[in-house]
């Protein structure tokens, strides 16, 4: 199995950026923690200028800050609304958001930008994948900006540790999520199944034959569509079978008995029982009614609800587990980071934007517009969130599942390994390959990567294992 070019260790990244060995010690460090309005003196990085952007004429003369946003569609539209509100709330800063596609697109674009030394002011990487850029000294610490009104205590606890390294904060939570099990409630009711959906994989296996009695476009209705890039969902799956991708001692365990059992269950369900299949776009198939189930992000809840309005009722449930096993889901989504550049004024302006977005009502609006978790604790008490849950209980399911959220295993801390996991799953989901052989080959690749990154990960002094 080939190693992905996105899988960059600190040494690889430093070499790619043309930085000598002496640069490895130049960790981004800020001033001692101070009050609000402070600045992270020492995080300025000469020679790294701002990437091109266009400032609307009505905002000329303000300090411009550029966010390369890994969002498209509805989520990007809601982000643009939040940025517009920030720009109207004051007269010194203009925040510009530019959609760059998804997380993998951002990873590639930002890596190239660092090499060219023309960078955005804000980036937003998923889970722990920001570490490769922290390790190349590309991100500025945030702690000196915190005060009594804006600090890490305002955010949901499960997500805070993922933004810290070696005692400093480099990411504040923003577009955070968990995976959910989505199902076609209308079809479940038609099939005489519990309208609250399945709780376990055994439930889904029991429900699938009843769903298959319903024909859609001349074919039996599938119980589940999976994607070729299901590595995030698979983290919940393997935990739900009592296994793990890796342990806290940096040993890859994805090919142990629990992992093989999980992937063999999926192989049989798809290729022998014919109750599921690998889709090019599971979300599209779900919205069109071809499949009665899929796994998706809470961040897709608003869009999925809109896409199926008037067609069928969407139901959501916690991610499935094997009967008798603990339900756990990986934290997902991303947080906001300031990119080290040649302007302290822009760094400070970014922090003001982060402070604005951490207001409870703004967090609630982001949640309502997208489905991302209302990451600010106080947002749950806003009328916006209360009304939303009352109108659509699926949002309440997403909130209730947060107690099961935990940080993904080390294997999921970099984009390259995530890509490798997805490719391995696709061999089983799509081709019916032998799970044990696939996982053994995958484990060897993942272990090589983890060994390469271990020193960097240990230096993080991660505080979030639970």
Label for each model-derived stretch:
Residues 61, 88-89, 189-191, 264-277, ...:
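Extracytoplasmic/periplasmic substrate-recognition and gating elements
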